[in-house]
Amino acid sequence: MITLYEAAIKTLITHRKQILKHPDSREILLALGLYWDKTHILVKCRECGKMSLTGKHSTKCININCLLILAIKKKNKRMVDTLIRMGADVTYIHLLKNKIKLSYNQLSMLKSNSQISLKELHAICYLLYGRLPKKIKQGMQLCKTMAGLCGELLCAFLAP
């Protein structure tokens, strides 16, 4: 069963070209841990399984564990969380020794936390809703809850 967070991330990555056209999207993606810096979105290469900027194989594909080490050094907890969810190996924490305060146990806790906060859910909804075509917006039923709205938005984007 896919979690709401994973579905939202999948949707955002799949439709990244549309989403990145809007300048405010970059800041939201950065806060959600889906952006490495202000120019690169995290996407897994389909061929080698490493991280790439386009999702296609190239010489610029980066090992996910190298990105994890950089994220830990930058103390970017959201990025660490995202990389672990994408398959980074938490045992690489030993390479950092005393350079950071995060322990192996803290990283393991991040991996098991699949909940999404209300603030993150709102940001995802805002991103998705703002990028929907007008026809779909008009056809959507009004939802009373934020979770219902997010579900409707994800269905609209994930539908074939």
Curated annotation (Swiss-Prot):
General function of this protein: Plays a role in virus cell tropism, and may be required for efficient virus replication in macrophages.
Family statement: Belongs to the asfivirus MGF 300 family.
Name this protein carries in UniProt: Protein MGF 300-2R
Species annotation: African swine fever virus (isolate Tick/South Africa/Pretoriuskop Pr4/1996)
